A protein has these predicted regions:
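Internal/C-terminal transmembrane anchor helices
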Residues: 133-158
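Short, well-ordered coil/turn segments that N-cap beta-strands
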Residues: 166-169, 197-198, 279-283, 312-317, ...
């Protein structure tokens, strides 16, 4: 029982320690759901760490159980943790299916470690079985080992590539260089350009008087000092503010403890498009159209397309377009690049249907399968995956031949000279062959 609990605790820690991009999202969700401002994930990981430590003590001192504390208390806490483990992951995977895909991607990329342990364990187990069943079955030992060894030869781990190393995926900076400067500000956009990003990704909102500006959240509370400037309007939707009011806000002071961004204003779309033009970047955006009743609800798309047209960056702009809006977009902005968005749920559209509708780019969540990526590329579509922050995930997509990714970790990914632990197939065969010899020698010992 202690071993089972220990394995589950370590799996919990491994999953969340390698999933830094989603930690903040989960924590913000739990804060919103409970109304309590706390670092919930840190509490959960400390709990899992203590359970793992207590399990280690139980396993180490299992012959002297009294020294590990009351057995009934450990059992109660252990069972509670298992219920928490399966309950939390069930909710997570139902709410965000891409996290389940990510778990499989993580396993596949680092599978050589698992394969090695499994090969050695099965070789030892097979040896014991043959030894216990007499000499007539000893011939089964090399045959069984060969089968176990051959499976990964034909199905290698995700860090193994055949032929030449694919071209490094280009990078779109998510809300600018959002880990180095306040998100969706000119500072973050220019920082991303200076780092060498291929393009910028942002969120566009329209003010109460028709000015297009950058803002991701529905309200201004998280990324501005609206609570100090307009104390009674902290929770009001951003689209209810006029540009005069928005221009008085500080969108930089919230960013850590660095005074360098104090006074950074909320930028208008025109200013960001100027950064795109001056640095020869590509541009992709989410347009947040206000609900009915807003004075510019029906004009937001036209205003945005006109702004892009006037700025002369249409040929470098990816417009995320619903099929019903394609004609309107092509009429207003003929040079724009139509992008099809693929989210967490639903069946991805066929390559043929996207090409027929005039799309040139697929902008998908990173859970998209490698087979689907290649199918889109074979149809002439550019494939961009979002949001990719972890070096191993970027490496996986690099080896898969993805065209580009959208990331918060611009500086880290741009600095990578090659994929993490990337291994040519020939080198992999040498390594795997060496491990196979070790397994064979170990199993042959009497």
């Amino acid at each position: 029982m202690a071993l089972v609990i220990f394995i589950h605790a370590m799996l919990f820690l491994a999953f969340w320690l390698t999933n830094l991009p989603y930690q903040e999202t989960l924590n913000n969700f739990l804060i919103g759901a409970t109304g309590l401002r706390a670092n919930f994930l840190l509490i959960f990981m400390v709990f899992a760490g203590l359970v793992a430590l207590w399990s280690t003590v139980h396993l180490t001192l299992r012959r002297n159980i009294r020294r590990t504390g009351p057995a009934w208390l450990y059992l109660v806490i252990g069972v509670f943790f298992l219920i928490f483990f399966y309950g939390s992951f069930t909710v997570l995977f139902l709410k965000n299916p891409v996290q389940l895909y990510r778990l499989g991607q993580l396993f596949q990329y680092f599978r050589l470690i698992v394969d090695t342990g499994l090969l050695l364990f099965l070789a030892w187990s097979l040896h014991r079985w043959v030894k216990a069943n007499g000499t007539l079955k000893k011939a089964l030992l090399p045959a069984g080992l060969l089968i176990l060894w051959l499976i990964p030869v034909f199905w290698p781990p995700g860090n193994v590539y055949r032929g030449t190393l694919p071209e490094k995926p280009r990078l779109f900076a998510h809300r600018g260089a959002s880990t180095l400067a306040p998100e969706n500000t000119l500072a973050s956009m220019q920082t991303a350009a200076d780092l060498g990003a291929y393009g910028l990704e942002t969120d566009i909102t329209v003010s109460a008087d028709g000015v297009l500006f950058l803002m991701h959240d529905d309200t201004l509370a998280r990324t501005t000092n609206v609570a100090q400037v307009f104390p009674k309007r902290e929770d009001d939707p951003a689209v209810t503010f006029t540009w005069d009011a928005l221009s008085r806000l500080d969108a930089g002071s919230w960013f850590g403890e660095r005074a360098a961004f104090s006074g950074e204003p909320i930028p208008i779309l025109e200013a960001v498009l100027q950064v795109v033009k001056e640095n020869d970047l590509y541009f992709i955006y989410d347009l947040r159209i206000p609900s009915a009743g807003h004075p510019y609800a029906g004009q937001a798309l036209d205003l945005c397309l006109e702004e892009i047209k006037v700025s002369s960056v249409a040929d470098h702009t990816w417009v995320l377009a619903e099929p019903g809006a394609i004609t309107q977009i092509q009429s207003a902005l003929p040079g724009a690049i139509l992008a099809a968005g693929i989210g967490y749920t639903g069946i991805p559209p066929s390559p043929a249907s996207l090409v027929a509708d005039g799309y040139r780019v697929v902008n998908s969540v990173y859970g998209l399968s490698i087979r689907r990526i290649h199918a889109y590329q074979d149809a002439g579509l550019w494939v961009n995956l979002w949001v990719v922050d972890e070096p191993w995930q970027y490496s996986r997509l690099w080896l898969a031949g993805a065209d580009s990714v959208t990331s918060n970790n611009s500086q880290g990914l741009l600095a990578m000279p090659r994929p993490v632990l990337a291994m040519p197939y020939g080198i992999y065969l040498l390594v795997w062959g060496f491990l196979g010899v070790i397994a064979a020698l170990g199993s042959a010992k009497e």
